[in-house]
Amino acid sequence: MFDAAFPNNLTEELCAVRKVMPERTFSDCPITISKDAISYALDNRIMEFPDRMYLMDIADTTYDILNQTQKQILCCIYTRSCDGYVREKYLRRLLDMPFDQWAIPFIVKLCDEYVLEIIEVIYNQLKDRDNTDIQSFCANNKTAMVKSYARMTSYWNEYYRKREWDFGKYVGRRLFRECLGYNRTFEK
């Protein structure tokens, strides 16, 4: 689980994280991860992780015993939780720490989701940051970013258009344009 999501040099750290993760799933779901996978290119390799993970959250006391790299790995993994509150909790933790390049795909993937509060958290954390690293990642994954932008737009149209009728002011669009560096050249 999540083997292809992290660089090979993090194998030991990933194993340590797996040991503290519960085996119990939400509502005793018979699967721990979805079959749908997310793929991005990073550092000349394909990173792949499940769209959703159904494992229960861990206790904060367990989180506290992990080292910084292990915490970052755990935060990345739990951004794929089926529970939006859990995704937001670990996203906040991830954005509050200095994160490595390999964490960027997990942050970027959350930018096209339907939970407005998560999009607002990302925008508010990234808007005043130098996002050159994230923008470079997005520019190297243009096909995936075009799909993500379309998905974000679709969610705005379906769920948030009545609240924010001007798409130019919608936080999801501002996130993609201002923080992720998305522009029309991605579509060519």
Task: Walk through the language-model features, giving the residues of each.
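Extended repeat-based scaffolds of very large eukaryotic assembly and lipid-transport proteins
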Residues: 1-89, 129-131, 135-188
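Buried hydrophobic core positions in alpha-solenoid tandem helical repeats
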Residues: 74-76, 104-108
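Short coil turns that connect the paired helices of HEAT/ARM alpha-solenoid repeats
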Residues: 79-82, 112-117
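Helix-boundary capping/turn motifs
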Residues: 82, 95-100
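Conserved hydrophobic register position within alpha-solenoid helical repeats
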Residues: 90-93, 118-123
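Residue-level signature of the C-terminal ends
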Residues: 93-97, 125, 129
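Alpha-solenoid repeat scaffolds
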Residues: 100-101, 117, 132-133
